[in-house]
């Protein structure tokens, strides 16, 4: 979703939709990167017409080092983009030695007059 891409771009942290994949720019996983997916649902109808929908962003921040600063940057960027934090959790992957901060974000948008 464009709204998520635009918000995450301001962090300066490499962000990948769905999964990190090797590219010419990133032949190996960066020390810090974001992977995200989105889901859109219809949330409000008036007289059988769509009035509002919700965009959920499921985001994972992966970091070899302390992820605190990057997590703050993401929080500021997503809030500036109009998203609200729904939940957040953290973990550590011993095999890869990456910290992972998983979060769910929500953006409510008014539907256009044609229902899109």
Q: Where are the model-predicted features located?
A:
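Small/polar-rich, solvent-exposed N-terminal microdomains that initiate assembly or binding
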Residues: 1-47
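Generic structural motif
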Residues: 23, 39-41, 64, 108-112
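Generic signal for short, ordered secondary-structure residues
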Residues: 38, 56-57, 84
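Short, solvent-exposed beta-strand/turn "edge" segments of beta-rich domains on protein surfaces
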Residues: 46-50, 94-96
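Oligomerization/assembly interface segments of phage tail-like spikes and tubes
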Residues: 51-65, 99-109
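Compact nucleic-acid interaction/catalytic patches
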Residues: 68
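Acidic-leaning, charged glycine-interspersed low-complexity segments
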Residues: 72-116
């Amino acid at each position: 979703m464009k709204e998520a891409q635009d918000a995450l771009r301001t962090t300066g942290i490499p962000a990948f939709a769905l999964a990190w994949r090797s590219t010419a720019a990133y032949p190996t996983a960066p020390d810090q990167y974001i992977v995200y997916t989105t889901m859109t649902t219809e949330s409000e109808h008036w007289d059988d017409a769509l009035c509002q929908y919700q965009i959920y962003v499921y985001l994972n921040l992966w970091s070899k080092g302390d992820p605190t600063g990057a997590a703050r940057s993401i929080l500021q960027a997503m809030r500036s983009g109009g998203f609200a934090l729904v939940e957040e959790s953290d973990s550590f992957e011993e095999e890869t030695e990456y910290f992972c901060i998983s979060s769910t974000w929500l953006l409510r948008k008014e539907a256009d007059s044609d229902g899109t």
